[in-house]
């Protein structure tokens, strides 16, 4: 009987876990839908901003004999000072979502250091912060809460310090790493060079001439302002993209956990019925044996 009670207790415990994981799956699914909508709206704004940068950059490129000469576009093929910004979640229970970002960030650190570059790490998200602190890796910046609730103002304040560092020559390159959303079942690691802006990614030779009239002396000022806004929006969009990926990863993890719990309950029920049958058989044998001994 003690064995039956133990199995019954396990069944009850697993069923409670199943209810919890299923509830977490439903919550993540609802949050994912909201984050997807936010990501769609953000992509439209980012595309328009990129178009403006392309148009102004093209105008400056054609106007100058030296081509596009702007601090935000000056590529350094052998950077000696690199800032890596990486985004992880504040919470776990989302499969390999955090570990994949941490793994790629660690690889990038090793790659840059092998080329003689000094790397500064800027972390967003508790899981990444905890990992590197545990491994005694110095973090130049660490923010908790922003990856769970992306905020444009806060993310802009965070990145403005890094941009200032770039303008002052304290860093040669700024790279952003995060786990991005592809669809409800797929996430992928994304690496974006934030600064300097990769001119090869801009369609400078194919964009149409802008109808916007800008004084030549204002071109550089306007481009600087647009690039800064572009950088601010890049980090904000990455936070949204990462959050969507986190929700989809957690939804998958909780779905798998719910299915596993269901299988465990099924196996435990079989085990319980078998043990109960054995207990009944034992009792019958004892009764029959007792009756036989009384004859």
Swiss-Prot record:
Subcellular location per the Swiss-Prot or TrEMBL entry: Cell inner membrane
Q: Sorted alphabetically, which Pfam families does this protein's record hold? A: ATP-synt (PF00231)
Q: What is this protein called?
A: ATP synthase gamma chain
The keyword Nucleotide-binding appears for this protein: no
Q: Which UniProt keywords apply?
A: ATP synthesis, Cell inner membrane, Cell membrane, CF(1), Hydrogen ion transport, Ion transport, Membrane, Transport
Coiled coil: which residue ranges?
none
Q: Which GO terms describe its molecular function?
A: ATP binding; proton-transporting ATP synthase activity, rotational mechanism
**What domain of life is recorded for the organism?**
Bacteria
What's one GO-annotated cellular component?
A: proton-transporting ATP synthase complex
């Amino acid at each position: 009987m003690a064995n039956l009670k133990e199995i019954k207790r396990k069944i009850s415990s697993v069923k409670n876990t199943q209810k919890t994981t299923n509830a977490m799956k439903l919550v993540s699914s609802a949050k994912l839908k909201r984050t997807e909508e936010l990501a769609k709206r953000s992509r439209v704004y980012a595309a328009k901003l990129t178009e403006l940068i392309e148009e102004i950059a093209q105008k400056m490129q054609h106007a100058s004999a030296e081509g596009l000469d702007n601090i935000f576009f000056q590529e350094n093929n052998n950077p000696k000072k690199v800032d890596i910004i990486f985004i992880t979640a504040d919470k776990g229970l989302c499969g390999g979502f955090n570990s994949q970002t941490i793994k790629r960030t660690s690889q990038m650190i090793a790659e840059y250091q092998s080329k003689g570059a000094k790397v500064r790490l800027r972390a967003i998200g508790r899981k990444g912060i905890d990992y590197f602190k545990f491994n005694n890796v110095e973090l130049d910046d660490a923010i908790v809460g922003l990856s769970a609730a992306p905020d444009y103002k806060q993310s802009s304040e965070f990145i403005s310090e890094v941009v200032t560092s770039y303008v002052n020559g304290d860093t040669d390159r700024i790279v952003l790493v995060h786990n991005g959303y592809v669809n409800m079942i797929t996430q992928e690691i994304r690496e974006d060079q934030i600064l300097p802006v990769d001119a090869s990614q801009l369609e400078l030779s194919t964009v149409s001439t802008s109808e916007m009239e800008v004084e030549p002396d204002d071109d550089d000022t306007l481009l600087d302002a647009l690039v800064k806004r572009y950088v601010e929006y890049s980090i904000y969009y990455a936070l949204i993209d990462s959050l969507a990926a986190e929700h989809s990863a957690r939804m998958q993890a909780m779905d798998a956990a719910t299915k596993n719990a269901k299988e465990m309950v099924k196996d435990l029920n079989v085990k319980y019925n078998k043990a109960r049958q054995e207990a009944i058989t034992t009792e019958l044998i004892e009764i029959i044996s007792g009756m036989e001994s009384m004859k």
